[in-house]
Every structure is written in C-alpha cells, then in structure tokens.
Design a protein with these regions (language model features):
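N-terminal structural segment of carbohydrate-active enzymes
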Residues: 1-114, 313-352
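Carbohydrate-interacting/catalytic domains
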Residues: 1-35, 40, 57, 69, ...
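Conserved alpha/beta catalytic core and glycan-binding cleft of carbohydrate-active enzymes
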Residues: 13, 222, 229-394, 407-409, ...
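Hydrophobic faces of well-ordered beta-strands that scaffold small-molecule active sites
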Residues: 33-35, 77-79, 138-140, 213-215, ...
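Short, solvent-exposed loop/turn segments at secondary-structure junctions
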Residues: 39-44, 83-85, 145, 219-220, ...
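Substrate-binding/active-site clefts of carbohydrate-active enzymes
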Residues: 40-210, 217-241
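Acidic, His- and aromatic-enriched active-site or binding-groove loops in soluble protein domains
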Residues: 99-108, 158-172, 268-280, 413-419, ...
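Glycine- and acidic
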Residues: 113, 183-186, 215, 219, ...
Length: 482
C-alpha cells in the first residue's frame, strides 16, 4: 500500500503536557470492587445526558454516570482501551467497526471518537477528576503487545514506517512472530520498546491522572523467560511513579499461560476462578452432581493454590468479562452466536461452561425464568462474597444480554437503530440499560445488597482459612435471596 497516511496517522505529534497534581483515592485492594466498562457503551443510552455528549469522556464524568456507579456500590471503573485505535480493514469492509478498541495506533493518545470537543485530553482529565472526587478510581485497559498494523500484509501507519525490524518481533527475514493472534507482537522487551511503554504509562498516570492499568496479554510483553526477568516489568518496578499504580495482568497470550507467575505488587485476572464458579453453578448443578466443589472452595477462599504467600488480593476474581458471554447469557445460551461479526460463527470460544436451563435463548416459561434469575443471583453472590478482588462486567447487574454473542467486539459502522437488520446483524446489548425492567431491577437490588455485605463484613487481605471465626446466629443479620 503506497498511499500516504500522514494526514490520517502522522508519525509524531509533539505536545507539552506537563504532569499535574492528582488527588488519587488510593483505595486498598481488599476494599476494591471493579466495574469493567466501555466509555461509549456505559453512557450511550443514559437519558440524563444530552444526546450529543453520550458515549464520550464528558458523559463518563457526568454526574448521572457517577451517581449510578456510586448507587450500585462499585469504587473502581476499568475502562476498555481508550488509546487511539483503528478498525481492521477486513472488518471495515464488512460495514462494521472494532468496538472494543484492542487495536492501537497511538499508545499515548486518547481516542478522538470518545471526545465531544476538539480537546479530548482536557475532557478526559475532567472526567477522571470528577470520578476521583466521588471516591472512584480509574483503571485503564492498555494494549502494548501489538498494534493495528497487523502482519506482513497489513497497513503501514505507525511503527512499520519507522523501523519495522526493531519495533516488532521477527522470526526470520520477513516473518512476524505472532504471540497475540493479531498479526504482530510489539518489541516491548527491547530498550527502545521499554522506554516507549514507560513513557506512555507515565503520561497516562501523570497527565491524565489514572490510578492503574490492566495489561492486555501481559506475557506477550515478555518473551525472554519468567516474569521476574522481564526488562519492562523491572522498569515498571523501578519507576517511582508507576510502582505506586495499581497493576493488573491478563496472565496469558495465545502461546503462553502464566497465571500465578507475576510478582507483588501485580494482581492477575484469575480465569481458574471463573471456570470453577461457572462449572459448579452451571455445569455440576445442571447435571445433578458436584464434582467441582473442591475447585470452588479453593477459589472462593482466595485461590491460595495459585497465589500462595501473595495473598487473596493478588486474584482479580471474575465470572464474565468483555470477551465471552454476559452473566445473563450464561443462563440463556448453550451455543455462541457470533454471526454479526461476519466470520460464519468461527470466532469466539466454543467452551462457555454455560447452562440454558433447557431452552436456548428467551422463553416465557415462568419456571425456567425463575431458575435463571436464581442462578444469576448465585453467581453474583459467589463473586462478591469471595476472597480476592471482584470484577463485574458492565450491565451484568441489570441482566444485559448480547443475544448469545461471546465475542461482541464489532458493531455496525452506522449505530442508527433504524439501519440495523435484526439481531443477527449486530452484537446486541452493547449499552447499559438505564431503565431496567422489573426482573432486572430485582437483580440490581440483589447486587447492591451483596456489595453492602462485602464492604461491611467481608473485606479482607488474608486467606479465608487464616481469618475464619464463628459468629453468633442472628436472623436480623442474614440476607436471603431466592
């Protein structure tokens, strides 16, 4: 491709963004409740925000957004990538866009598509400050493991045009090493790669003012040995600013699984926990026997079999995340439905550990509906009452559905509902429902009560087995969910 991309993606833009004083909430890990959300999806349907501001950084800092987060009881929001990103050419050709944003073209630039003004930096800073003023921390999902340039046939819009050989990992003259499943692997372990990532992290920390980072496909950032030997992670540990940030690893990539290998003060997404909880509630109970009790017990007590002396707050517990079924879909669907992405349903995981309670998708059967509602509450209770750091996915508290999609990373280029051709043409449920029906309001009430219980009696930094004590029975202190 010999077209000039300079007017779309200049190789450099020099700015003078000075570090600023930021009042971080500094919430202890054992008190943290993380809410994973998308800037646009969280605010797009909020009726209290002017239409022209919905889906933007300004909407993120709107008082109604903040009031909602405070009402449900979460105190940290983990934002899907907000750095400048691009849609893959093949996806764009199908009339769709990359909604999630895991396709970076500029590590230290806020995505312009989420700005309501011509000054996205100031707009984002104001949103972060407003969240901080209300006791809510901001964690960014950052993608330094690959870029939007893809493999050998991909576009030349950033690092390929500067120094392709040194900015990407190569296995031969032109062969890209792909540890990410996205066509390339960024050389984050080389000195120039380390410097760039550190500078980017410091920019987000000191200029924007965020409180922490979740590192996408973290093992891909280090291919030289174990996590202790990583040049990048060593540089983060030595940096006086970054070592104070909250650091969360997604401890796997497509060729390496590293759960439990990261060292303090890192925390890790715990998919062992996810699978154990799903297997117990949606696998064993569905079959009428409980082989997964042992795995469930170790998981809810802090996963000491994985994190050992590091303690339970090393585990970020989750049952759902942006990729995979929503909690509602876990009890509605057995089969994935990713046809909207245009890949003939080949994409997405085929192993979901879900249970549709005998009917695939929506039903009017009151008995099935009651079981599904109870299962969602059981999943919520397990997550929020476990030792570790809980993370809930946006909308699970109000029964958000993606209609069986477990890879809802694309949306139509045109978000006008009048132009959507049925459920099969889009990954539904990409926005938060700000006006839930009676059943979903019931879920939200249960969610809020569970967080209240957690924050008043179950916050702990040690494994359950070392802190367990018996309390006198008092029915007035018992919360019961059906």
């Amino acid at each position: 491709d010999d077209r000039n991309s300079a007017k779309f993606v200049p190789l450099s833009v020099v700015t003078n963004d000075a570090p600023r004083h930021v009042k971080h909430p500094r919430i202890n890990w054992q008190d943290l409740v993380i809410y994973e959300a998308h800037v646009k999806g969280l605010t797009w349907a909020n009726p209290e925000i002017p239409e022209e501001e919905r889906g933007t950084y300004k909407a993120l800092g709107h008082q109604s957004t903040i009031d909602y987060l405070k009402k449900i009881g979460v105190n940290a929001i983990e934002l899907l990538p907000i750095h400048e990103h691009a849609t893959e050419p093949a996806i764009w050709a199908r009339g769709r866009r990359n909604h999630w944003g895991y396709n970076a073209i500029a590590f230290s630039t806020p995505h312009r598509g989420y700005a309501s003004t011509s000054d996205p930096i100031s707009e984002l800073q104001e949103a972060v400050d407003r969240l901080h003023e209300n006791g809510i921390e901001v964690i960014l999902d950052v993608v330094y493991n690959h870029t939007a340039e893809g493999g050998p046939g991909g576009p030349h819009i950033t690092f390929k045009g500067i120094d392709n050989r040194n900015w990407y990992r190569h296995g031969g003259t032109s062969h890209y090493i792909d540890n990410t499943g996205c066509g390339n692997t960024f050389s984050a372990g080389k000195p120039h790669g380390v410097r760039l990532v550190i500078d980017s992290l410091r920019w987000w920390s000191q200029v924007i003012g965020v409180d922490g980072f979740r590192f996408d496909l973290a093992p891909a950032l280090n291919r030289t040995g174990n996590m202790i030997d990583s040049a990048l992670f060593a540089a983060i540990a030595a940096d006086p600013v970054l070592r104070q940030m909250k650091l969360i690893a997604e401890p796997w990539d497509i060729s390496r699984y590293s759960l439990g290998e990261f060292q303090y003060p890192w925390r890790e997404w715990n998919d062992y926990y996810r699978d154990a909880v799903r297997q117990f509630w949606l696998g064993d109970i569905a079959r009428g026997y409980g082989e997964g009790v042992s795995a469930l017990a170790s998981s809810i007590s802090g996963s000491s079999n994985i994190f050992y002396f590091r303690g339970p707050t090393s585990s970020v517990n989750f049952i759902t995340a942006h990729d995979g079924f929503t909690m509602n879909d876990l009890v509605n669907y057995h089969q994935k439905n990713n046809l909207a992405n245009g890949e003939d349903n080949r994409d997405g995981n085929n192993t979901n550990r879900s249970w549709n309670v005998g009917v695939e998708g929506p039903t009017d059967d009151p008995k099935i509906l009651q079981i599904r509602q109870s299962l969602q509450k059981s999943l919520m209770a397990t997550l929020l009452l476990s030792s570790g750091v809980p993370m809930i996915t946006m909308g699970d508290e109000v029964g958000r559905t993606q209609f069986g999609s477990n890879n809802a990373f694309t949306l139509p280029i045109d978000l006008n509902k009048e132009n959507w051709n049925g459920v099969s043409a889009w990954n539904g449920g990409w926005t938060l429902d700000w006006e839930p029906n009676e059943a979903n309001q019931d879920l939200q009430n249960a969610f809020m009560e569970l967080i209240r219980i957690r924050q008043t009696t179950l916050s702990r930094s040690q494994y359950l087995a070392t802190t367990c004590r018996f309390l006198s029975s008092s029915l007035s202190r018992i919360s019961r969910f059906q």
